[in-house]
């Protein structure tokens, strides 16, 4: 009974297992049919249970066998890979080329020939038309000898660098250079900036120039603290007078300008040569020579900065200096000047004879107005149109001639005739006042007519001034008050030039001693007598009622001139404010 029960239990378990296997097989076959479209024609329900069990057991064994075989193959492959490099070396080394094989001998010879061709030196001259045969030992030994000679050369170079640079790292560099037989130095380590002897000399010269400039400032008492220039408006003034070029005095050939800049960035260089440059932050400024005419500026400096440009030749410069202001046929007016600098009122107040006092004074005002522009021609941009642009000549920056003495002499001369002219003008006024009540009614009518003509002339000049101010470029905006001043003086000069000179004489006395004024256009007693003697009698008669009419028309012109004379004070205040900022 017990044995049967044991067999029955096995049978029941086998049937249960087979039923599960059948279900799995049916599911797998259905999956193959639906997904892959494979129909194996197997029906697990038809087969008995023992067949299914045997089949599944066999499949399990196959799977185990395949897994074990794959694992063994993988392990064997890994072992082969680990042992493969030494085996390959052993296999490569034993088959050394035997001298008996002809193919291997040919290959070896061809390789040796290639090596020889690479190592061959350039052919030496052929003795008697035959090439020199170089043995193989020499060909092989030459690069070795070169490599053996290279290390001592590098050691010598390193020793020199030790002496010059005195570095502790030079030993390490010597080891590196000796280890490398290429013959090339390695660019490593800290680089040092060396200053050449030439640069040191230049620096010493600059320092000497700076120290000399301080001593020159102390030696020249009249030039100290005359010019204050900011870094924004760097200009220096040279004051040439006359055409003399004497170089006797060292004080006269050295130009010193004292700078008071708020920023303190400007450095001063004073040289005794023909050219002088002021370097500010590395930039060079060429100087512009400025003439100060007592008729135009009336004691006010006119500073203009000019950008560096190629200047004109000396021929134009000499012609500019030697030209007379009263020469009507000279070329001074047509030198490519801007329209802002041209004389606009050259014909007003002039008659057919150019001998009368009014015409000469008019033209002298025009000449004095044009004179600063003559300096522009040979020192600035405007000279490019007339001069040769390819010339290397630069404008001289220093004063020519004994300008200090001439300056003082001209001031003394100008003050003496001005005092005489004041007396003459006072006498003329008294005579005119005495003649006014004693004159007849006809003379009064003539005076009124001429007074109206003078007023119309002044109105025309004012209209022309307004038109020209509108047409002038923006660059001349700073010089407008000075132009108005000159124009007002011009209208006064057509009637009576003596009073103009009296007005101009007042600011001349307040000028600093370092600024040289041109010889002012003055009419002394002797000159006035000569000019009056040369004038025909008709012109002299016409001049007397003009002077009488001038006294009637003085108040409007004087009020205009007073308003114009107030403007320079405002301009000076503005300039002081700019310099302080």
UniProtKB/Swiss-Prot annotation:
Residues 1-49 are lumenal. The keyword RNA-binding does not apply. Residues 380-442 are annotated as: Lung-homing for mammary tumors. Residues 77-221, 280-581 are annotated as: Disordered. Residues 108-126, 421-433 have a biased composition (Basic and acidic residues). GO terms for biological process: bicellular tight junction assembly; lipopolysaccharide-mediated signaling pathway; negative regulation of apoptotic process; negative regulation of transcription by RNA polymerase II; positive regulation of angiogenesis; positive regulation of autophagy; positive regulation of canonical NF-kappaB signal transduction; positive regulation of NF-kappaB transcription factor activity. Residues 72-168 are annotated as: Interaction with BCCIP. It comes from the Eukaryota. The modification N6-acetyllysine is found at residue 263. Widely expressed, with highest levels in liver, kidney, prostate and small intestine. Not detected in endothelial cells. Residues 1-71 are annotated as: Activation of NF-kappa-B. The modification Phosphothreonine is found at residue 142. It is a single-pass membrane protein. Residues 71-581 are cytoplasmic. Coiled coil: none annotated. One of its GO terms (cellular component) is nuclear membrane. Keywords: Acetylation, Cell junction, Cytoplasm, Endoplasmic reticulum, Membrane, Nucleus, Phosphoprotein, Tight junction, Transmembrane, Transmembrane helix. The modification Phosphoserine is found at residues 179, 215, 250, 297, 305, 310, 343, 368, 414, 425, 456, 477, 493, 495, 567. The chain crosses the membrane at residues 50-70. Down-regulates SLC1A2/EAAT2 promoter activity when expressed ectopically. Activates the nuclear factor kappa-B (NF-kappa-B) transcription factor. Promotes anchorage-independent growth of immortalized melanocytes and astrocytes which is a key component in tumor cell expansion. Promotes lung metastasis and also has an effect on bone and brain metastasis, possibly by enhancing the seeding of tumor cells to the target organ endothelium. Induces chemoresistance. Interacts with BCCIP, CREBBP/CBP and RELA/p65. This is Protein LYRIC.
């Amino acid at each position: 009974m017990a044995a049967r029960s044991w067999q029955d239990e096995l049978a029941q378990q086998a049937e249960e297992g087979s039923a599960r296997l059948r279900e799995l097989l049916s599911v797998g076959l259905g999956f193959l049919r639906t997904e892959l479209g494979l129909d194996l024609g197997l029906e697990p329900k038809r087969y008995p249970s023992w067949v299914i069990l045997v089949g599944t057991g066999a499949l399990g064994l196959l799977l185990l066998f395949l897994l074990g075989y794959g694992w063994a193959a993988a392990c064997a492959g890994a072992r082969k890979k680990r042992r493969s490099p030494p085996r390959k070396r052993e296999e490569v080394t034993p088959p050394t080329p035997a001298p008996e094989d002809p193919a291997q001998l040919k290959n070896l010879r061809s390789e040796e020939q290639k090596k020889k061709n690479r190592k061959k030196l350039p052919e030496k001259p052929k003795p008697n038309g035959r090439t020199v045969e170089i043995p193989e030992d020499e060909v092989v030994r030459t690069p070795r000898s070169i490599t053996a000679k290279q290390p001592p050369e590098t050691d010598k170079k390193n020793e020199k660098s030790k002496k010059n640079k005195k570095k502790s790292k030079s030993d390490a560099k010597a080891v590196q250079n000796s280890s490398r037989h290429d013959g090339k130095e390695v660019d490593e380590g800290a680089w040092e900036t060396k200053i050449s002897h030439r640069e040191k000399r230049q620096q010493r010269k600059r320092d000497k120039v700076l120290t000399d400039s301080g001593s020159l400032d102390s030696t020249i008492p009249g030039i100290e603290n005359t010019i204050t220039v900011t870094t924004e408006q760097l200009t220096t003034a040279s004051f040439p007078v006359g055409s003399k070029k004497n170089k006797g005095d060292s004080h006269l050939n050295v130009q010193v300008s004292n700078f008071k800049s708020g920023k303190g960035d400007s450095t001063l260089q004073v040289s005794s040569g023909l050219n002088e440059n002021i370097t500010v932050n590395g930039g060079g400024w060429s100087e512009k020579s400025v003439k100060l005419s007592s008729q135009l500026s009336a004691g006010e400096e006119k500073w203009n900065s000019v950008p560096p440009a190629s200047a004109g030749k000396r021929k134009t410069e000499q012609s500019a200096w030697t030209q007379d202001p009263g020469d009507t046929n000279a070329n001074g007016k047509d030198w490519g000047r801007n329209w802002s600098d041209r004389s606009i009122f050259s014909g007003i107040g002039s008659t057919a004879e150019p001998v009368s006092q009014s015409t000469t004074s008019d033209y002298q005002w025009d000449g004095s107005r044009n004179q600063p522009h003559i300096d522009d021609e040979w020192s600035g941009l405007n000279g490019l149109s007339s001069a040769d642009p390819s010339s290397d000549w630069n404008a001289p920056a220093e004063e020519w001639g004994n300008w200090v003495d001439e300056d003082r002499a001209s001031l003394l001369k100008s003050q003496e005739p001005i005092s005489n002219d004041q007396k003459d003008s006072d006498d003329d006024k008294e005579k005119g006042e005495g003649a006014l009540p004693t004159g007849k009614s006809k003379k009064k009518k003539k005076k009124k007519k001429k007074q109206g003509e003078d007023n119309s002339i002044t109105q025309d000049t004012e209209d022309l001034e307004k038109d020209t101010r509108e047409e002038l470029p923006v660059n001349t905006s700073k010089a407008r008050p000075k132009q108005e001043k000159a124009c007002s003086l011009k209208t006064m000069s057509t009637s009576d030039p003596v009073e103009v000179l009296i007005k101009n004489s007042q600011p001349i006395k307040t000028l600093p001693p370092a600024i040289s004024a041109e010889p002012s256009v003055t009419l002394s007693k002797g000159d006035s007598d000569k000019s009056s003697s040369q004038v025909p009698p008709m012109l002299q008669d016409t001049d007397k009622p003009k002077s009488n009419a001038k006294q009637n028309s003085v108040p409007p012109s004087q009020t205009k001139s007073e308003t114009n004379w107030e403007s320079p004070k405002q301009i000076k205040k503005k300039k002081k404010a700019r310099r302080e900022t």
